Amino acid sequence: MHSLLVLFVSLLALGALKKHLDFRAAVDKIHNYPGLRFIFGVQSFIFGKRIPYFAAGGLSLWDTKHQDFVDHDADIISSVNIFPTCATYMIADAQAIKEITTNRARFPKPLQQYKILTFFGSNIVVTEADEWKRHRKISAPSFSERNNRLVWDETINIVKELSDDVWRGKNEVTMDNIVDLTVPIALFVIGVAGFGRRMSWVEDFTVPAGHSMPFKDALHLVSNHLWMKVLLPAWFLRSAPIPRVRKFHTAYEDLEKYMIEMIQARKTAEKKEERYDLFSSLLDANEEETDGNTKLSDSELMGNIFIYLIAGHETTAHTLAFTFILLALYQDEQEKLYQHIKSVVPDDRLPAYEEMGKLTYCYAMLLETLRMFPPVNLIPKQAAEDTTLHTSNMAGEPVAVPCLAGTALAIHTPGLHYNPRYWEDPFAFKPARFLGDWPRDAFLPFSAGPRSCLGRRFSETEAVAVLTYIVARWRIDVKEEPQFAGETFEQRKARLLDSKSAITLYPVRAPLVFKRR
């Protein structure tokens, strides 16, 4: 027994020594560049909040925003942890970020971190170099002006049905959590403009042969509970003793069947109907491709449309939620937006797609929300060759950052968006800052460079359409709750904007009231 104990302690000591040496090697690789040191890095999801020197915390990037850079006197800092053992440069310098995002060969995406997004098949997000170009050649044409018009028209139809039918006869509607409104709106839009499947606010009980649930329900369950597919093994999903997990697995398999059927129906149709939803456009572009080496397989087609689903649904739903919260908190800004909308779209008529360019304050409102609440807090990259990054300290003096090949890089979106070097009074909600000239290189909600989000215009069109229609007809207020009576404005703001991050950043709970104008 004593010998086993000695062996166990010896192995433990050897493991600890190896980890210590690996940690020192990681620190030496970056020449002990100033920054943060932890036992557990941000990759350790067990720890949400930061514990100094112990755990970086999964939410630390959002919680600290630009403060870590101020504390270490530069807009590029290091972060080194033991579990997993790695050193990363965190970057909130706009020029350094521009250099990284515009040079794909020198600063590629670390593909191993994206493998979890290959559920249905390889796609544009999880590929690099020539393979990425192949996916982009087929995918990019789907995001056309005709698709943008479809997004606008269908979004207006969806919120009009909500206002005229679902909320008919009601002068006041209470949402206990605003995401309960914005998530279905975004879901319906991606359903029709993404998949060509029009959905309704009315419950659908029709289940096609060979399926377990309607398309709408399968899409809703998969998009809302994708974390299960990310975190849980396939064998557990299939036989989990938890009904909610099994239901997700059924929905996932059903959605896959729906997509396969849609592909086959489009391929075998004698006369192809001219349609501009993303899936139909993607299939058409693939069919028209004459180079057999460029064509996407069925699994790659599904992989790409799945990425559109997640990116489009999550990002827009949560951005709209944050925008409604900010409008409820800042009534003066809501009034400015209302007056602006009425000046562009008078007489209670429906807003037209051609008027989107005139809705400048509505667009500014959206951009300011995205600045303050970027969907993704971190964009990972890596150095493919030895190089030097350049930044400056808080006094404006130049700082050179040695960067060896293989070094991990992380574009720190909240650090950039709250950097006072680029944004005056960064914690203030000021949509007007986007009406004139503004620092475009310091704004990264959709990434930047050649790999920036293809669906940016899709998301912006949907969001502006929703805001234009709803704000013109409904005033948004905070729901008064007795347990929060007497709270200050800052306390109320902190409560309503309390956020967590899963696939994207989202508000925890924000009860709002919509009052008919």
UniProtKB/Swiss-Prot annotation:
GO terms, molecular function: heme binding; iron ion binding; monooxygenase activity; oxidoreductase activity, acting on paired donors, with incorporation or reduction of molecular oxygen
Cofactor dependency: heme
UniProt cross-references to CDD domains, sorted A to Z: CYP56-like
Superkingdom of this protein's organism: Eukaryota
InterPro entries, sorted: Cyt_P450, Cyt_P450_CS, Cyt_P450_E_grp-I, Cyt_P450_sf, Cytochrome_P450_monoxygenase
Residue numbers binding heme: C453
SUPFAM superfamilies, sorted: Cytochrome P450 (SSF48264)
Pathway this chain belongs to: Secondary metabolite biosynthesis
EC top class named in words: oxidoreductase
Broad class of where this protein is predominantly found: membrane
Localization of this protein: Membrane
Keyword Cell wall biogenesis/degradation annotated: no
EC annotation from Swiss-Prot or TrEMBL: 1.-.-.-
Pfam families assigned: p450
Membrane spanning stretches: 3-23
GO cellular component: membrane
Membrane topology: Single-pass membrane protein
Keywords, sorted A to Z: Heme, Iron, Membrane, Metal-binding, Monooxygenase, Oxidoreductase, Transmembrane, Transmembrane helix
Family: Belongs to the cytochrome P450 family.
Its job: Cytochrome P450 monooxygenase that is able to use trans-stilbene as a substrate for oxidation.
Official protein name in the record: Cytochrome P450 monooxygenase 124
Species in which this protein is naturally found: Postia placenta (strain ATCC 44394 / Madison 698-R) (Brown rot fungus)
This protein's encoding gene: CYP124
